[in-house]
Design a protein with these regions (language model features):
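Rossmann-fold cofactor-recognition segment
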Residues: 43-57
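Conserved glycine-rich Rossmann-like NAD(P)H-binding loop of the short-chain dehydrogenase/reductase
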Residues: 24-39
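Conserved N-terminal Rossmann-fold NAD(P)-binding element of oxidoreductases
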Residues: 4-8
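Conserved Rossmann-fold cofactor-binding substructure of NAD(P)-dependent oxidoreductases
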Residues: 53-69
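Catalytic loop of short-chain dehydrogenase/reductase
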Residues: 80, 84-99, 107-108, 120-161
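C-terminal helical subdomain
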Residues: 170-173, 182-224
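N-terminal Rossmann NAD(P)H-binding glycine-rich loop of SDR-like oxidoreductase domains
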Residues: 10, 14-20
Length: 224
C-alpha cells in the first residue's frame, strides 16, 4: 500500500486530498495543529499527527513522529494569506506568520522527510501559488503572500540540487473555493485535489522530467 504524508491537511485542499487518497486505497498520514483538525482527519480513516507548522519546536518533531516510516509522496499543503499591498509597512506579526507558515514549515519538513522518501524514490511537493511567480506578477496586492510563495519556490528549486534522489515539485493549485480562495473561485476543492493527484501520478512515473519543476494543477509548466 502506497503512503502519502499531507502536512497541513485539516481543511480545504489538504483535507480533500486526504479523502481522495483514502478512497483510492492509499495509507494517509495527515498533520493538523488542533483537536478539531485531527478529528476531521481521523473521521476519514487517516492517521493524524499533531504538528503546528508555524511553531519551529512543534515542526522539528515531525521526523520523530514519523520514525521508521517509508513515504511515497509528501505534500506540504499548509498556507496563510495576507492581502495588504506595499503602500503600508507590514507588521512583524503578519510577516512572521506568513514566513513561518508558508516557508519555514516546508523548509523544516523537507529535510526531515527526505530520508523516508528516498527509499521509495518518492516525491516531495508543496502547494505554492502562481502569485509567487515573478514573471506573472501584474499587481502589488497580497505582497507578503507573493513574497512568501516566491521564497518557497526558491527553496524547492535549491532543494532539488541538494536532494538529487528526490523529485521536488512546486504546484499552483488553481483558484479554489476555500477559506483563502473564497466562494467566487472557479475551482472546487474536489476538482483541484483530483487534478493535483493526477499530475502527481505523472510526476511519479516520469520523475527525471519533473525534478525541480513549478507546475499548474493540470500539469502545465509555470514560469518562475
Amino acid at each position: 500500500m502506497a503512503t502519502v504524508l499531507l502536512i497541513g491537511a485539516s481543511r480545504g485542499i489538504g483535507l480533500e486530498m486526504a479523502r481522495q487518497y483514502r478512497q483510492d486505497g492509499w495509507r494517509v498520514i495527515g498533520t493538523a495543529r488542533d483537536d478539531a483538525g485531527l478529528a476531521r482527519l481521523r473521521a476519514l480513516d487517516c492517521e493524524a499527527l499533531r504538528v503546528d507548522v508555524a511553531d519551529p519546536a512543534s515542526n522539528s518533531g515531525l521526523a520523530w513522529q514519523l520514525d521508521g516510516e517509508k513515504l511515497d509522496v509528501a505534500i506540504y499543503v499548509a498556507g496563510v494569506i495576507d492581502r495588504a499591498d506595499t503602500t503600508t509597512p507590514p507588521t512583524r506579526e503578519t510577516f512572521d506568520q506568513l514566513m513561518h507558515t508558508n516557508v519555514m514549515g516546508a523548509a523544516m519538513a523537507l529535510p526531515q522527510t527526505a530520508p523516508m522518501l528516498q527509499e521509495a524514490g518518492g516525491v516531495f511537493a508543496v502547494i505554492s501559488s502562481v502569485m509567487g511567480s515573478l514573471a506573472q506578477t501584474q499587481s502589488g496586492g497580497s505582497a507578503l503572500y507573493r513574497i512568501s510563495k516566491a521564497a518557497l519556490n526558491m527553496w524547492m528549486r535549491c532543494a532539488q540540487f541538494d536532494h538529487p534522489k528526490l523529485c521536488c515539485v512546486a504546484f499552483h493549485p488553481g483558484w479554489v473555493q476555500t477559506d483563502m480562495g473564497g466562494a467566487q473561485a472557479p475551482l472546487t476543492p474536489v476538482q483541484s485535489a483530483a487534478d493535483l493527484r493526477q499530475t502527481l501520478e505523472r510526476v511519479r512515473a516520469h520523475r527525471a522530467q519533473y525534478q525541480g519543476a513549478f507546475l499548474n494543477h493540470d500539469g502545465s509548466p509555470l514560469p518562475w
